[in-house]
A protein has these predicted regions:
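Acidic, small/polar-enriched beta strand-loop surface segments
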Residues: 41-50, 60, 72, 86-90, ...
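Extracellular and organelle-lumenal recognition/adhesion modules and their flexible linkers in secreted
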Residues: 41-194, 285-298
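Intrinsic-disorder/low-complexity, polar/charged segments enriched in Ser/Thr/Lys/Arg/Asp/Glu/Gln
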Residues: 3, 48, 94, 107-111, ...
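Short edge-strand/loop segments of extracellular domains
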Residues: 128-133, 348-354, 415-418, 548-554
């Protein structure tokens, strides 16, 4: 988190104050970034290609309107060998580049070198669309000159332009384009601006205070939390199956996991629809929560027990039409049966019975049908070669697509794989849309074909799904075998977390199936990271970051900061204690082994120091390896430097590096006093507290030894020696 005290004397940060320049946008969850820019070092906010065009493209430059033609050119160049050619053929036109990421109220200087290709036509100017232009325009011909414009950003997004006024027909050239903070026109460079990000988060609330009791002193002391807070507060997750289905936007989805007291089933996609029990002729039973579903959702399923094919109970409901003007559908369900007769798992049809049916035939084969009581020539069936009425749980799906030229195609999928031979029927070639499929029947139809067994997770979609293999994996394995980074990405996708805000190391551990029902996204991700034995955090740029466990024993990792003991805070202390020491450890995994390992020598010296760890890996070998690795790292006390305060502002040679520290950074201290066990300390940052104010800039890091034990590294001396303390890494 970040705490900021901001001056609000002008009322700019007062919520709902109409005179605020930000009105009405001062709200909770406003995004705040804390960055540092060394004003003495020039830099370019534009990319190298947008600045110098040496890659052979026009970058993201574009024209304001017709009458301007842009191209990459080697005919002229102010620097390098290429530039942006701008062919004018009209008046009041501009070549411009959109730039996003400006800070409202901050001063910037925009500049470019322009080669004016002749004496006729308009002079060339430079400016920012919607703000203004420089009063100085080009006064040269057939040579290069530099134009610049200093402005204050009024939006996060602006168009930076090079423009003409009067009618002009000639070709000019642009090169050496540069955007930088401040009002000083610096020498051109393609080096990125030296901006250091220290925090990125969202305001919890906007408090307004008057410390002096009057209008002359108003402040807002805000608390800002990073994305971890948002992930912790996000909606709780549903089952792995429901979350996977949601990625494909079902029109309706009935998990059928209601309690035994239920008489109806509810939709989880948001349509508000329900399914209720209906009798066909006489007899039979339909009991909620009396069976089990796929197993990966940890939920029950209803059991259908009819008297025979034409007597029993089924579920019936009406759902809003999915994609009313569309020509494509997918119908899916999870079911278990061993009955060899014509059975309907789920039917999706209109009020007259025109629609799709998923079921089995009298031989136990899976079938998908398109039925049309008004025109039986359109009736088609796809039948699987294998028998799936085999007492096992299977995922069934049918897709219906229309090519817009008069042909519809029906396909059958079982367990994520297409089965049987696709069937086609003809439709109108122009303007064809599907009947209004609204009626949903589960476990039978109004005319019979009653189902015996369990059914769950019936769903309908307004598209032809290409992800049915994922649907089957969700229902069969729960994606067991995902790497740790893949599982975190999967969880993120369930809550629409942007991929651009993730930076995940490739995981070293595979994750087992986990019932995600009721979990918060952050706690689930953290369980994955703990199983990886890695670190999951939000970095200083606001990006969700995973460091895999390999980083924990990477002896070749670069040193981020190296300082002399003479310049660190005098309050620094070394300590060696039993905090964190474990010599009797039990590691277990859900649905798998539980392993206990003990370091007898450590127990003899320090007494029993026990701990239990639960992981969600998918291998019992991982359990054993994790237990031995934890014991190797933690059974003996190490010398720690728990807190290290560093100067991030004035210390020559190291202040800039300190401003770049983050979780996982490597810090080395040289020249330790003679009383220390070693003349140097090699440390890993596990967390930190940063203070920035009029009195200076300090960073107090919580650290641990960079390598708690020495890893065995083959072909390395001394790490490759097997007769020393080097240990095989987990």
């Amino acid at each position: 988190s970040c705490s900021l005290t901001l001056d609000n004397t002008d009322g700019a940060l007062s919520p709902m104050l109409a005179s605020s320049p930000y009105y009405p946008n001062v709200k909770p969850q406003n995004r705040i970034r804390v960055t540092h820019r060394d004003p003495s070092v020039p830099g370019n906010l534009l990319s190298a290609e947008n600045s110098s065009f040496e890659g052979g493209t026009t970058g993201t430059w574009t024209r304001s309107a017709s009458g301007v033609t842009l191209a990459n050119s080697s005919a002229q160049a102010w620097t390098g060998t290429k530039s942006l050619s701008v062919a004018w053929s009209s008046s009041l036109k501009a070549a411009w580049i959109p730039y996003a990421g400006l800070v409202i109220g901050r001063t910037y200087t925009w500049s470019a070198y322009v080669y004016v290709g002749g004496v006729t036509g308009s002079s060339v100017g430079i400016g920012v669309a919607g703000i203004g232009a420089s009063g100085t325009r080009s006064s040269w011909n057939n040579t290069w000159g530099r134009l610049s414009y200093t402005f204050v950003a009024t939006s996060a997004n602006h168009f930076l332009e090079v423009s003409i006024i009067g009618s002009t027909t000639r070709t000019d050239y642009v090169d050496g384009a540069m955007l930088d903070e401040g009002s000083t026109l610096a020498a051109f460079t393609t080096t990125p601006a030296p901006i250091v990000h220290r925090f990125d988060g969202y305001v919890d609330e906007w408090p307004i205070e008057w410390p002096s009791g009057g209008d002359n002193d108003s402040r807002s002391a805000v608390r800002v939390f990073d994305l971890q807070s948002r992930l912790s507060r996000a909606r709780t997750l549903d089952s792995v199956i429901t979350e996977t289905y949601r990625l494909d936007s079902p029109g309706w989805h009935f998990p059928l996991d209601e309690s035994s007291e239920s008489a109806s089933a509810g939709d989880r996609s948001g349509s508000g629809s329900t399914l209720e029990a209906r009798q066909v002729n006489t007899g039979g039973e339909l009991t909620f929560a009396s069976g089990t579903g796929p197993g990966t959702d940890g939920a029950s399923a209803p059991t259908f027990a009819p008297v025979d094919r034409y007597n029993g109970l089924y579920l019936l409901g009406i759902a809003p039409e999915v994609d009313p003007l569309g020509r494509h559908r997918t119908l899916s369900a999870v079911a278990l049966t061993s009955t060899l007769q014509h059975q309907c798992i789920v039917e999706w049809c209109d009020a007259y019975g025109v629609g799709i049916i998923l079921g089995t035939n009298s031989s136990g084969n899976a079938v998908a049908k398109w039925t049309n009581p008004w025109d039986t020539s359109k009736n088609v069936t796809v039948t699987s070669a294998s028998i799936y009425a085999d007492g096992q749980t299977h995922t069934f799906a049918a897709t219906l697509s229309n090519d817009g030229a008069g042909t519809s195609t029906l396909r059958l999928y079982v367990d994520g794989v297409e089965r049987g031979t696709a069937a086609t029927f003809t439709t109108a070639a122009i303007g064809y849309i599907l009947p209004q499929l609204k009626r949903i029947s589960v476990g039978g139809t109004a005319f019979g074909d009653m189902f015996t067994g369990t059914i769950s997770h019936v769903a309908g979609y307004g598209s032809v799904l290409t992800t049915l293999a994922d649907h089957h994996a969700a229902a069969s394995t729960g994606f067991a075998g995902d790497r740790s980074d893949e599982r975190i990405e999967r969880i993120a996708s369930w809550i629409d977390f942007p991929a651009a805000l993730m930076n995940l190391d490739v995981g070293d551990t595979t994750i087992g199936h986990v019932d995600s029902t009721g979990k918060s996204p952050w706690s689930y991700m953290q369980d994955v990271a703990d199983t990886e034995a890695g670190v999951l955090f939000i970095d200083t740029t606001g990006v969700l970051t995973l460091h895999n466990r390999t980083r924990g024993y990477d002896s070749a990792a670069a040193v981020d900061v190296s300082v002399s003991a003479e310049v660190i805070d005098p309050d620094v202390r070394l300590a060696s204690g039993i905090a964190g020491v474990v010599n009797d450890i039990t590691v277990s995994r859900s649905g798998g082994a539980s392993v206990r390992v003990v370091d007898a020598a450590s127990v003899s010296t320090y007494g029993v120091l026990g701990e239990s760890i639960s992981i969600i890996g998918d291998s019992d070998l991982d359990v054993l390896n994790r237990a031995n690795w934890e014991l190797a790292m933690r059974s003996t006390p190490v010398v720690k430097l728990p807190e290290l305060t560093l100067d991030g502002l004035t210390e020559p040679g190291t202040a800039a590096a300190v401003r770049g520290l983050d979780i996982g950074s490597r810090v080395q201290i040289t020249g330790m006093p003679s009383q220390a066990p070693s003349s140097a300390a090699d440390l890993r940052v596990q967390g930190y507290t940063e203070r920035i104010g009029a009195g200076g800039w300090t960073l107090t890091a919580n650290t641990t030894p960079f390598l708690p034990i020495a890893p065995l590294i083959l072909d390395d001396d001394p790490r490759g020696r097997t007769d020393s303390t080097n240990r095989i890494a987990y």
